[in-house]
Amino acid sequence: MQKYLNYKTLYLSLIILCLISLCGAIVYRFYSLNNIGVAISLILAIVLFIIIQRFYTAGNTPKTKISSFKFQVSSFKNLLLTSNFLLLTSYFLLLTSCFYVLLTHQTEQSIISPWQVLPNYFFIFYGLATAILIMIIAKRPGSNIAIKQYSNIILISLHYFLSFSICWIVYKIGYGFDQFIHQATMDLIDKAGEVHPKPFYYLGQYSLIIILHKITFISIEWLNKLLVPALAAVYLPAAIYHALTKWFEDKKTNLLLIITLLIFPFSFFILTTPQNLAYLLLILIIFLGLTCSNVFELLIIYLLAITALAIQPIAGIPAILFAALLTVFHGDKVKIKK
């Protein structure tokens, strides 16, 4: 039986994370995030997820189908058949070398920039990896174009993760100041169940990390380091590609454009803070809004916006306003399909 990874899978995984964050924030605000509070949060998240799933299933028509972005989980095997094996091998060797260089040049010193401790040949490895990735994408596609294009997104996500991981790997203790404050707060909540006073902001990230910590046994320290870089690497390339394909037909150019976006500053995605996580959701909301075509997708945008509001109002309020404007726009143009 073939398994598929598609946009529905990405939507649903994002929905689950948002529901855990939002339900956990509400439970923590009015109760606590002890074991009972975590259990209540998970039950609420599961119930809401089932309701959303039923809503999607009931209203899923050819026009509202989300699974158009579909490719096999075994697509790397197919990618080997449609791409140059030497290019792929070279890319993974260079990618591994980049991570190795980062791990062997960690420092506990207070430095202004990670480039102070990284050797010059890291830039050579990174540049060669980027060039080979561009060659893989630009290479003439084989017989199964869809599988190759979608497999390339996985490679781009790996490249994004490498790019977003430089700081949290090099700074062995941690990067920035806010991250330490938030981690200390979450450690206290994990031990005591709550910390007073309870604000109306930050709770979305606190609840998400603490609940993930309790159900996966991954330390809060590691979750606090990896959350935003990992989520950004997974969801940003897919969301951007999905939006671009709705506007431009040349899929190869769209993929190359996603890689090119790395030339812009991406400091929001190199460490986990409530503001950075909320900004990530806001960016995802904007790209999802560009392709919103049915009520289900609009509801998902509202869910992401409310979650962003529970994490950091600076990004949450614009997210809510964008969702409202999107509703007015589609309502006026009668573009939203039930």
Predicted regions span which residues?
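Membrane-embedded, hydrophobic transmembrane alpha-helices
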Residues: 1-69, 75-145
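Short juxtamembrane and helix-loop transition motifs at transmembrane-helix boundaries
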Residues: 2-7, 112-113, 185-193, 216-219, ...
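Membrane-embedded helix bundles of polyisoprenyl
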Residues: 16-25, 156-163, 205, 209-214, ...
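Hydrophobic alpha-helical membrane-interfacial segments at the cytosolic entry of transmembrane helices
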Residues: 334-338
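Hydrophobic alpha-helical transmembrane segments of multi-pass membrane proteins
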Residues: 10-17, 169, 173, 196-197, ...
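Extracytoplasmic loop-helix module adjacent to an early transmembrane segment
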Residues: 149-194
